[in-house]
Amino acid sequence: GLANSSTVTRGRLSGFGGAPNMGHDPHGRRHATPAWLNMITEPDPMQRGKKLVVQMVETFQAGVKPTFVETLDAVEVAKTSGMPLAPVLIYGDDVTHVLTEEGIAYLYRAESLEERRAMVAAVAGITDIGLGVDAKRVAALRQSGKVVYPE
């Protein structure tokens, strides 16, 4: 429910393709781009922007398998294969937006881990994660513009 993702699933261990480019964490930036600047949430000359990392997924995969889960399959794969860490492609705290057929969650605007989880749930449809969020909470997130549904 925190927007972590991996290409590793039970029965399938695939590579990360171009994702190793995500493997660095540079906080400094010589030339700010408009997209990078748009990720700034507080007016402060020392505030930093953020790389846009947008997850675009359907709430369910083939075979009615939910995309949004509490624990990635990669965690179990790591345990059973003796890996020291789960092979996570992108950690949720790097994800700025989650876009599904339900709507978009502007995760970079979350003010807490709890709010981030609620924002993911708000666009997770009828998955267990999506059904775990209160309708009043979703309404408040929509009112604040942190979650937007198609009209």
Summary of predicted features, one role per range:
Residues G1-E151:
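Conserved phosphate- and dinucleotide-binding cores of soluble alpha/beta proteins
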